[in-house]
Each structure stands twice: as C-alpha cells, then as structure tokens.
Amino acid sequence: MKNKRDRLFFTLLFVPQAPQSSYDRRAELEVLLAIPSAQSACGMEITMTDRHPYYEFEKDTYEIDEFDCSSIFLFVGKERALLLDTGCGIGDLKGVIRKITDKPYIVIASHGHMDHIGGAGAFDELYINPADNYFLDVSFEKMLENRRNYADFIRKREDKYYPYSTENDMLCWEKKPKLLPLSDGQTFDLGRRIITAYSCPGHTPGEMVFIDSKTRYLFCADACNRNLLLMQSGDHTEGRYVSVEKAAKAMERIVSMKDQYDHVINSHHDYRGFGAPLADYVVDQALECMKKIVDGTAEIREIPDPLQLNATKTVAVYGDVFITYSKEGVYETR
C-alpha cells in the first residue's frame, strides 16, 4: 500500500463486525475515519469518539452512558451546568456536553475511583472530597493502564460492540486538574436549580451523594446499589478504610432525608434501566443489610462476581441487595 493512511483505511474496512451490535456499521467507520482530534499510534490524527448514548430522563437532566463502564450525569440550570463524574475517560466527553449545552459548567467527582475520575484530565478543575484525593496520586501511566483494563473487562463481560478503541479513545492525561474541596452540605446554585452534596462514606472514605432541588432525585453514585462494595482494603491509620458500622450510620442519615427526594439513581445502570431510577426499596434494603452485618445476623451467600470473569464472591444478602465486605472490617476501631 502507498502510505499509512491507505493501510489504516484497509485495516478498518476489514475489521470483523461483532455480533448483536446495536450500532450502525457505517457510523462506526465514520467515527474511526473522522476529522482530527487525537494522535494515533501511526502518527496521523484521528477523532476521539463522542458517540456516548445520553438520555434526558427529566427536564435538563441527562444520563450519559460511558459504554456500560459508568454513568455520568449532567444538570443544566438557567445560568450554568454541573457535570457529575467523568467516567473512565473514554472519548471526547467535552464534545458530548457541547451537544447538550453551551453553558459553562462545574465538574464534580462523586468519589475517587478511576471509573468516575478517569476523564478528569480533560478539565481544569475538579471538586472532590479531600478524603479521596489519594486516588489521584497514582502516575498518569498507571492510571491509563487501569482505565484501559477496566474498559476491556466491561467489553468482555457484556460481549458487545462499542464504538471506541482503548488505544485511540483512552489517552494518558497531560495534566492533573486543580482539586477543589467538596464538603458535606456544600451547595451549587446553577440558576433556579440547586445541587447539594452530602458525605456518605462506605464505598470509599470520600463518597458523596447529591440531592437535586429541581427533580427531587438523590444521585447516590456508588454509595448505594443492589451490588454494594464497601471500602475495606486500606490501612486504618491512613483514613483509607470504612467499616460497615460507619457506612451504616452514613446510610441511615441519607435514608432520614427522604422528605427531600422522591427517587434514587446510582452511577451504574447494571441493576436498573438506563435513565430510570433504582427501585424505591433499594436504599432501605442496603441499610438493613448493613445493620444485619453489624449485629451478626446477615445471610451470607456465594454469588457470581460481576467484576471478575468466571469467579464468585462471598456477600451478605438482604432482599435484592448484596454487600461485599471483609469480616475484619465490620466494626470501628475503639
């Protein structure tokens, strides 16, 4: 072939089509051969995908699906917008936001896991609970490796075609955003719409949840789900560990705020419909499950591990909720 572009075009034409694709094949090639935006391995520039599905499930309230890796939420007010989480950092998230609004926006992390802050390198500033700042201390190269590994795992687990490549659409950060402190009770006025942040340690030490005054939704990120993982692999002395006892108290406070919200939506739509809330009872069942772990009466069961292929894990179960924790991490250190 004459040059690198010819070779790339030939390669793209003969990429085998994955079965059960929900995307149009012609659109796939259009994305891969689109206008310049990122540097490819062969030296030519290609566009990063902005084909993230998104859905306006309430007025000016959008769930952006990062190809089943995580959900990103965008709230649009009269004066500005707020972006909750940045996913793993697949493709051109800024381009997706531009499709929805031209208003200036704030960027907030619900917590520090890489499937929620992986795209933060594209932004200048990031609000995050300081208790989770340490998640961003890893090198850019190691973070990129972790992000790509997670995205590849989701692709294998779901057995779907997604319109992105980890090589061209998941790039190393060029800079770290300025970290701004996010605290319990902090409010963000978007113009006739206020988002309030609340601390809810459990999944991570700095996990935050958010109540939207306009929709009366509680956005609980990873603080609550039918598949709840508690942060129990860290060192007690470094503040990187959350006991079940502490997580239960935090969840109990959020449950006590039910007069402020009507629906709950989390940051992965594995156990709910895309753009749809969690079942109303999930928060209550999660709290009850934690309480039973603490008092020693929880039902223990072995289930398939959704975060590993062909593996199982031991969990506590109550109703439709199962919680992953360690026996050593039930109680606060006295």
Which residues does each PLM region occupy?
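Intrinsically disordered, low-complexity segments enriched in serine/proline and basic residues
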Residues: 1, 5-15
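Accessory terminal helices/loops
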Residues: 13-14, 21-44, 249-334
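Metallo-beta-lactamase
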Residues: 33, 37-44, 49-56, 81, 89, 131-201, ...
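Conserved beta-strand hairpin/beta-sheet module of binuclear metal-dependent hydrolase folds
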Residues: 50-99, 210-225
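Hydrophobic/aromatic beta-strand patches that form the interior of the parallel beta-sheet core
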Residues: 62, 106-108, 127, 180-182, ...
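Short glycine/proline-enriched coil/turn segments at helix->beta-strand junctions
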Residues: 78-79, 101-104, 120-125, 213-215, ...
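Active-site HxH/HxHxD metal-binding segment of metal-dependent hydrolases
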Residues: 90-187, 226, 277-302
